[in-house]
């Protein structure tokens, strides 16, 4: 899950605390943080590592749906929080980006499963282990 973003230049660490140490050493925090893991503490952690007056973008559907965070952090930093919903109607745009070479789909960490392995695919996707970001079930 971390190799692909790192190959694109993202700063990748296992926790917000590790990221915060990196940013403290650089004396610079990112002005925009994209949180797409949906983890239980990820929303609050994204606020913690966003630069003052910056923006935290929460992508997808966080789990659990009710998120708990300290209002002190975004209030003190004067952060903007923006939620980005998923969309069903983006297939044509995505295929065009792949065709034009804007997105390199072959580098995207996807595991493919046969139809009879569908239960395993769902279990693997839910477990979020390893580098897999998506499970694809093929007939």
Regions found by a protein language model. Give the residues of each.
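Conserved beta-strand scaffold positions in the cores of enzyme catalytic domains, especially
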Residues: 12-13, 81, 112
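Glycine- and other small-residue-rich loops at beta-strand/loop junctions that grip anionic moieties
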Residues: 31-36, 59-63, 83-84, 107-111
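CheY-like receiver
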Residues: 21-26, 49, 97, 121-124
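Glycine-rich phosphate-binding loop and adjacent beta-alpha segment
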Residues: 40-102, 139
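Hydrophobic residues within beta-strands of alpha/beta enzymes
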Residues: 12-13, 53-56, 135
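C-terminal hydrophobic helical "lid"/dimerization subdomain
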Residues: 44, 88-139
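Adenosine-nucleotide cofactor-binding segment
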Residues: 1-45
């Amino acid at each position: 899950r971390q190799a692909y973003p790192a190959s694109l230049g993202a700063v990748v660490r296992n926790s917000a605390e590790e990221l915060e140490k990196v940013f403290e050493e650089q004396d610079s925090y990112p002005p925009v943080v994209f949180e797409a893991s949906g983890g239980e503490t990820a929303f609050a952690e994204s606020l913690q590592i966003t630069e003052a007056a910056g923006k935290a973008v929460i992508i997808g559907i966080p789990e659990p749906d009710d998120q708990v965070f300290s209002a002190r952090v975004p209030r003190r930093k004067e952060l903007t929080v923006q939620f980005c919903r998923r969309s069903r109607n983006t297939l044509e745009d995505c295929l065009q980006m792949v065709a034009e070479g804007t997105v390199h789909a072959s580098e995207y960490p996807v595991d493919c499963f046969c139809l009879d392995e569908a239960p395993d695919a769902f279990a693997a996707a839910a477990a979020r282990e390893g580098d897999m970001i998506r499970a694809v079930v093929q007939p």
